[in-house]
């Protein structure tokens, strides 16, 4: 804009009268296309959409990679199928999550997760065998089913280690891949909705640096209490993630989609040299921690390179993520084509 000494453009109004006179699908497309010029957080969402759409379309082409980081509550929510679709269509090249981000995906193959209310009485939930994830409810039976599924897998891995006289060191990502294979064998009718299954099928590594921080950690502990010698070694996973994200060995563009903050965000960005990063977070600068600090702090702390293209969208990922990933075309175009055609 003339006379303004920094990048800017005229605000674009959303023509609400027009939205009332067109079909729902076209109206959604118009709103998505309008986001970059609306201002405030809508502009950040519009900018983030353009990065995400282009990256998903280009994943695997010319060495380009998309890496997804998410917190466990998101896989507990209805976003699970969205993530599974990205893996099924090979739109992502690696995943970083918490232990719960693995467990809750598998648990949904074994039982239903319910939607309740944020204000439900916690004592009553506990007395009725229900666990809370915000307003989501997970019955105790689901975790018992998960134990029945997971312990035999540990037994097989332990036997492999013992037979190799412990020259075989099992990493968290290898265990997660074994979980995907077990789902295909044990739950063939349910595994099609699982992110972990599709990552296994398409050889997409899933990294979980805090693998023992959850139900799987409990089971590994109790298994080793009665049967000594099961070893889980996370160090090779760090090396593998760094190799995937090292610019000196990759000619393509690396884009990181970070949904939520905490461990997944920090572990991914500290080990990957990203060209573009999209954050979706409700974290506040006042937290004073690297997992939810702002873009300037992340640059200062070395998580982002000076030339990294970064957009931080402040909001609930269950609301923002579908808008980032939703195609605004009529379905004839490939995923990721930008609205402006560029």
Curated annotation (Swiss-Prot):
Pathway listed: Protein modification; eIF5A hypusination
GO molecular function, one term: enzyme activator activity
InterPro entries: Deoxyhypusine_synthase (IPR002773), Deoxyhypusine_synthase_sf (IPR036982), DHS-like_NAD/FAD-binding_dom (IPR029035)
Gene Ontology CC annotation, any one: cytoplasm
Record: residues binding NAD(+): 72-76, 98-100, 104, 213, 282-283, 316-317
Pfam families hit by this protein: DS
Keywords, comma-separated and alphabetical: Hypusine biosynthesis, NAD
Disruption phenotype: RNAi-mediated knockdown causes cell growth arrest followed by death, loss of DHSp expression and a failure to sustain infection in mice.
Annotated GO biological process: positive regulation of catalytic activity; protein heterotetramerization; regulation of cytoplasmic translation; spermidine metabolic process
Gene3D superfamilies cross-referenced by the UniProt entry: Deoxyhypusine synthase (3.40.910.10)
Function, in words: Required for the activation and stability of deoxyhypusine synthase DHSc. Required for cell growth and survival.
Family: Belongs to the deoxyhypusine synthase family.
Binding partners and assembly: Heterotetramer formed by a homodimer of the non-catalytic regulatory subunit DHSp and a homodimer of the catalytic subunit DHSc where DHSc appears to bind spermidine and DHSp appears to bind NAD(+).
The name this protein goes by in its record: Deoxyhypusine synthase regulatory subunit
Annotated organism of origin: Trypanosoma brucei brucei (strain 927/4 GUTat10.1)
Lineage, opening ranks: Eukaryota, Discoba, Euglenozoa, Kinetoplastea, Metakinetoplastina
Gene coding for it: DHSp
């Amino acid at each position: 804009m003339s006379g303004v000494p920094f990048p800017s453009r005229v605000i674009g109004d959303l023509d609400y009268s027009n939205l009332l006179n067109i079909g729902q699908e076209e109206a959604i497309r118009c709103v998505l296309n309008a986001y970059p010029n609306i201002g405030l957080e809508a502009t950040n969402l519009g900018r983030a959409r353009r990065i995400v759409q282009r990256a998903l379309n280009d994943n695997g082409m010319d060495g380009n990679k998309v890496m997804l980081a998410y917190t466990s509550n998101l896989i507990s929510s209805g976003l699970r199928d969205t993530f599974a679709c990205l893996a099924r269509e090979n739109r992502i090249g690696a995943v970083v999550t918490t232990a719960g981000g693995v467990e809750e995906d598998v648990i949904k193959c074994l039982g239903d997760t319910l939607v309740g209310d944020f204000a439900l009485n916690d004592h009553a939930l506990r007395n009725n065998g229900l666990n809370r994830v915000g307003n989501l409810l997970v019955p105790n039976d689901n975790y018992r089913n998960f134990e029945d599924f997971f312990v035999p897998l540990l037994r097989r891995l332990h036997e492999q280690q013992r037979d190799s006289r412990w020259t075989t060191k099992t990493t968290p990502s290898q265990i997660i891949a074994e979980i995907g294979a077990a789902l295909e064998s044990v739950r063939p009718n349910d595994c099609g909705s699982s992110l972990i299954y599709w990552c296994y099928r398409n050889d997409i590594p899933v990294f979980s640096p805090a693998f023992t921080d959850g139900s799987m950690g409990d089971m590994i502990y109790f298994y080793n209490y009665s049967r000594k010698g099961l070893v889980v070694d996370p160090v090779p996973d760090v090396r593998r993630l760094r190799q995937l994200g090292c610019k000196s060995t990759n000619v393509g563009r690396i884009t990181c989609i970070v949904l939520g903050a905490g461990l997944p965000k920090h572990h991914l960005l500290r080990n990957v040299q990203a060209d573009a990063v999209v954050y979706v977070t409700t974290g506040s600068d006042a937290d004073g921690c690297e997992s939810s600090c702002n873009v300037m702090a992340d640059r200062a702390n070395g998580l982002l390179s000076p030339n990294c293209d970064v957009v931080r969208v402040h909001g609930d990922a269950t609301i923002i993520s579908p808008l980032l990933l939703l195609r605004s075309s009529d379905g004839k175009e490939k995923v990721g084509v930008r609205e402006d055609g560029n």
